[in-house]
A protein has these predicted regions:
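A short, mixed-charge helix-start or loop-turn motif at secondary-structure junctions
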Residues: 20-24, 154
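C-terminal catalytic-base region of ester-bond hydrolases, centering on the histidine
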Residues: 122-175
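Active-site loop signature of alpha/beta-hydrolase-fold enzymes
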Residues: 25, 88, 160
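Serine-dependent carboxylesterase/thioesterase catalytic core
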Residues: 1, 5, 13-20, 28-125, ...
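Rossmann-fold NAD(P)-dependent oxidoreductase module
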Residues: 9
Length: 175
C-alpha cells in the first residue's frame, strides 16, 4: 500500500515493479540479514545479471546500500532512489531493540563501513528524497545524503507519507 502510487505510475510507463516483503520487518536480525534476503529475492525474480533500478524507503535505504556496496549489487543497478533513508543514522534507533536498530544508530559499525565504501557506488546514479519535517529520522538531515547529485526536499509532513508524495513519485517516474 505504501508504494501503491509509485508502482502504479511506473507500471503505466511500462516498467515492471516488484515490492519485496523482507522479514522480519523490524530488522531484529540486522541490516545484513535483510540485504541477503533482498539479494535472494532479486536473483529469484530477475536472475543473477539483469540490471534494474532500486528504490528504498527508510530502513530499506540502508538495506539497499548494504546490498549495493557489500553484496555487490551495484554492478547491476544503474540507479538507486533513496527515500527518507537514515544514511547517517537516527537517534530513534536508541529506543528500539534488535540488531537492525543498533545498525542504524549514528556512528554504528555498519553505517561507518557503508560510508567508507561509498566509492563502490561510483557507477550508480544516486537520487535522494527527504523531508526536513521528518520526525522519524532524527536529525532529518541524516536523510539528505550528500553523495547524491540529485537531492529533493519534498517538505512532506510525515516520514511515512514520503513514498506516496506527489513530488517524489513524479521525480522518480520522470527519471
Amino acid at each position: 500500500a505504501m508504494f501503491q502510487r509509485l508502482v502504479a505510475q511506473l507500471n503505466a510507463q511500462g516498467h515492471r515493479c516488484w515490492v519485496p516483503k523482507l522479514r522480519p520487518i523490524d530488522g531484529r536480525r540486522g541490516i545484513h540479514d535483510l540485504a541477503c534476503k533482498l539479494k535472494q529475492y532479486v536473483d529469484e525474480q530477475l536472475g543473477p545479471d539483469e540490471p534494474f533500478a532500486l528504490v528504498g524507503f527508510s530502513m530499506g535505504c540502508i538495506v539497499s546500500r548494504q546490498y549495493l556496496q557489500v553484496l555487490e549489487g551495484a554492478r547491476r543497478v544503474p540507479a538507486f532512489f533513496a527515500i527518507s533513508g537514515p544514511h547517517e543514522g537516527t537517534l530513534l534507533a536508541y529506543l528500539y531493540f534488535g540488531k537492525g536498530a543498533r545498525d542504524m544508530r549514528p556512528g554504528s559499525a555498519l553505517l561507518t563501513h557503508l560510508k567508507m565504501t561509498e566509492d563502490r557506488l561510483s557507477q550508480v546514479a544516486l537520487h535522494v528524497y527527504w523531508t526536513s519535517l521528518d520526525l522519524t529520522i532524527l536529525p532529518a538531515r541524516s536523510c539528505d545524503w550528500r553523495l547524491a547529485a540529485d537531492r529533493l526536499n519534498s517538505q512532506a509532513l510525515l516520514h511515512r507519507f514520503m513514498p506516496a508524495d506527489r513530488k517524489v513519485c513524479a521525480d522518480i517516474v520522470q527519471r
